[in-house]
Structures are given as C-alpha cells and as structure tokens.
Amino acid sequence: MKIDIPCPPAEVAHSRTLPGTFYADPVIFEAEKQAIFMKSWHYACHETALAEKGAFVTLQIFDQRVFVVCDRDGQIRAFFNVCPHRGHHLLEGCGQEKMITCHYHGWSFDLTGRLAAARESGEGKKFVGSGLCLKPVQVGFLAGFVFVNLDTGAAPFSNFTAELAASIANVIPDLSGYKVREGTSYFGGDYECNWKVAIDNYLECYHCETAHKSFCDMMDVKRSTFTLHDNFIYQFVPSGGKETSAAYPINLVEDAVDGHFWLLFPNIVFSIFPGTKNFSVSWVEPVSVEMSIRRFVTLTPDNISKEREAARSKWGLSVLNEEDRQICRSVQNGMSQRGFDMGYYLLDSLNGNLSENTVRQFHRMYMRWMFPDAGVRT
C-alpha cells in the first residue's frame, strides 16, 4: 500500500538536510517501509551457512518472513516463509531439512519450492493445488554474503552492486579466503534513534575529532577522502602510522592499517577496520520510527591472532559503537525539538571527509527512492 507524503522543500539534499519530521513522524516511517525497504536488498547470511544441501536460514523484514535454502543441486534459493495452503509459517531459525513441511496440515514442498505432497489429497478429494509452488524471493551475492529482495521486479543484485563489488575487490582481492570465525559475529545493540540518524552519523567523520578521541589517535582523519556513486558511498580513512594508540595495538607490517568503508543504500555497510585482517558487513535494522538495531558479522583469514582480533572487536563494540549510540540518541531527541527544523551541510569541494558531502549524497539517494518524480539527482 502506497502512502502519500508531501515532498520536502527544494533545498533539501542541496543546501539543507532532511527535515526533523522525516526522522520522527510514524507516517513517514511507514511510507519508507513501502518505498524503500520492501524494494531494497537485505542481509540474510554468509554463504557458508548454506553450504550443505537442505541447509536453511530464516529472517524477518518487518512483518514479512523469508527463508533461504540450499537445494539438492547446490543452488541457493529464497522464498516467503508462508504456506500457500492456509498461511501458516513453514520454518523457524536455521537448520537442515530434506523437505519443507508445514506443521499445520502437513503439506510438504521440495527444496525448489514445488508442492511435493498434500496430505489426504488422494482419490475422491477435490484438490486444485497441483503444480503449486512457494512464492520466490530474489537472491543476490556479494563478498560471500547472501542478500534477499522482496520486490520480484527489482533489478538483479549484481546490476545494483557492480561498481561496489569492483571497489571492494580492488581493496581486498584475497577476500575469498576470509571466513566467519567463531566469536567474530556479534550483535551491536539497540540504537534509540531513527535508522537515518544512525546512517547520517556513520557517513561523516566531521564529528570524529570531538566524539571519537581514540579513533582519531589511531587514524589520520584529516586526510580522509570519499567517492560518491548512485547506489553506494566509499570512504577511505588512512592510518595514523602508529603501532600504539589510545584504541588498540596495530602491526604496521602485517595488519590492515587503513580504514575502508562502503555504504550500500539504504542501510548496509561493508568495512575494513585497522588491526588484524578483517572484512565486516553490518546493517542498521529499522524497528520503529525512533528505534533501530545495528548488527555486525566479521570475516577474517585463518592466520590471525584470536586475542588481537578479540581486542579490536571489543574496542569497536564497547568504545566506538557506544560513543555512536550516545550521539544518535541525543540527535534523535533533537529531531522533535521546536528549535530544530532542517539541518545544514558542511560541504567540501575537494572531497575531504571532514565534511558532510556524504550525508548529502545519502539524502539524495533517499529522495530519489521516496520521491522519484522530484528530479533529485545523485
């Protein structure tokens, strides 16, 4: 169901930010669900979770349930997690099954989604379900991760992410050797803010020198740069060249020393953080207009120090992530204050990251999805 909301003023995503109401109005949040999240790509799992035939994972995108499964030929497929007979859900959690069986009336489907058996539908019964299939969901792959899209009319994920995939491969060409290790996947915690507050904050390091002291002691944020694309934003933060900092120790010879960060619209982040070699995906999951959850999954190669990786992860979660959570909580409160209407951008024509060009680009992407007739270009 399409929800019509007024297009914001013309200066939005040019000289002014999105209005505060776009972060605090439940009606706008509901409109975003339909215009953005029911049509965009969502993280499902790493492909190693589906390495065995019949292996499956489930996920929920707002009120829509989905499962992803490896069929008997090794192909990864996704379906809406609902039985077409009477609407009961089919699978829970993750696991491995030879058939997909509904525990309401016992209908079963093979791993390609086709109806295999409807209990008691033999001779003498009127049955019109022959040839029935589960409704498929689009699947895409990037950097070993599996993504799904509820919009059957969406362009293939490979088209949407072609430039992004090339950018990641250019930075980390040996990524295929990285795996999800025990202890490297973790939950980032609740963010008491609208999802866009968290993304806005992530996209600029203009606030880093005042809000992230240990990060700035480790990195040379003044030499940060960015590139803007139609569907993603890339940020590069060079190393400060110190093995010892207020954050955690770095081996300048063996470790990843620079920071690389990619945002895929609307809410998926890929990153390489200084320290033991790593590659992460994280996403800001909208829960309500004023609540989000940030989740992380990290890949690492075989030959890393588990102790040093744990130290890097601990700092990221307990220091950097916590600093951002506090910032975002305060900003969310400001979105409904009478003294705030629309914000301003600090822009840099030289693509320096101590600016908010990246935030403006994100707002332009947002406007293009929410108001396609407004003529906003990215």
Where does each model-flagged region fall?
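Generic structural signal for secondary-structure transition and capping sites
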Residues: 37-41, 88, 207
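Short Pro/Gly-enriched beta-strand edge/turn motifs at strand-loop
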Residues: 39-51, 118-123, 263-268
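Short clusters of hydrophobic/aromatic residues that line enzyme substrate/ligand-binding pockets
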Residues: 44, 90, 115, 215, ...
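Rieske [2Fe-2S] iron-sulfur-binding domain
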Residues: 49-152, 156-167
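C-terminal catalytic domain of Rieske-type non-heme iron oxygenases
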Residues: 69-70, 75, 81, 145-378
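Non-catalytic accessory segments flanking enzyme active sites
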Residues: 18, 22-61
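Short, contiguous pre-domain boundary segments
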Residues: 3-21, 178-180
